[in-house]
Design a protein with these regions (language model features):
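Bacterial N-terminal signal peptides that target proteins for export
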Residues: 1-8
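Hydrophobic h-region of N-terminal signal peptides that target proteins for export
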Residues: 11-20
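N-terminal "domain-start" segment that seeds a small globular fold
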Residues: 20-44
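Non-globular targeting/processing and membrane-anchoring segments
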Residues: 21-24, 29, 168-194
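Short active-site neighborhood of thiol/selenol oxidoreductases, capturing the structured segment around
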Residues: 44-62
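Hydrophobic beta-strand anchors of alpha/beta hydrolase catalytic cores
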Residues: 53-54, 85, 136
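Structural microenvironment flanking redox-active thiols in thiol-disulfide oxidoreductases
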Residues: 65-106, 116-123
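Thiol/disulfide oxidoreductase modules built on the thioredoxin-like
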Residues: 105-107, 116-164
């Protein structure tokens, strides 16, 4: 009997954690600003009408570096179709680390800096749960966050990250499905009048 109580308690705890870490999706993206240095910023609202992917990274994180490589490829392939990638380093020493990171990876999109608190607030990540990097946010052409992932999500597993990001980008760039046509009277069939 004690065993079943422990299992029940662990199940409830797991469900509470899962619901606590779930951000509200879909939701309108706040007009988040990424600091580019020298008083310059890039704002998400500048890209209304485009599909935007925001990557939150740590410059020294190998998974983040891999994500930046994949996103660089996506920007080059899909930029002309309306994709815009942005990235933000969130570690304490990001200002010192970012120039070397940019020289090494040469991403074809803006990369700046935000505090961890700004990033956690933007992603609606519970402060009581450890955040695993990177964080990716997918925003549609109307400014709605449709999906977001963090390092612990299977979406960002090393073996499938490029395939998963590509599929999500293609899904978001696809034209909306046409609404089904309403069924009406068939053409060429006359109704009999009585």
């Amino acid at each position: 009997m004690r065993f079943f109580r422990v299992i029940a308690a662990l199940t409830l705890l797991a469900m509470a954690i899962a619901s606590a870490r779930a951000a509200n999706l879909p939701r309108r993206s706040p007009d988040f600003a990424i600091n580019l240095g020298q008083g310059k910023q890039v704002r998400i609202s500048q890209y209304k009408g485009k599909t935007v992917v925001v990557a939150f990274i740590l410059t020294y994180c190998s998974h983040c570096q891999k994500a930046i490589g994949v996103l660089s490829k996506m920007q080059r392939e899909y930029g002309a179709r309306g994709l815009q990638v942005l990235a933000s380093a969130t570690e304490e020493m990001a200002a010192a680390a970012l120039p070397g990171f940019l020289r090494q990876f040469d991403p074809p999109f803006p990369v700046g800096i935000n505090t961890a608190t700004e990033f956690i607030t933007y992603m609606q990540h519970p402060t009581m749960l450890q955040l695993i990097m990177p964080g990716l946010v997918f925003i549609d052409k109307d400014g709605i966050i449709r999906a977001q992932y963090e390092g612990r999500d299977t979406f960002l597993e090393e073996t499938g990250v490029e395939k998963n990001i590509r599929a999500k980008v293609e899904e978001m760039l696809a034209p909306p499905a046409a609404a089904p046509k309403k069924a009406g009277a068939k053409k060429g069939v006359a109704k009999k009048s009585n």
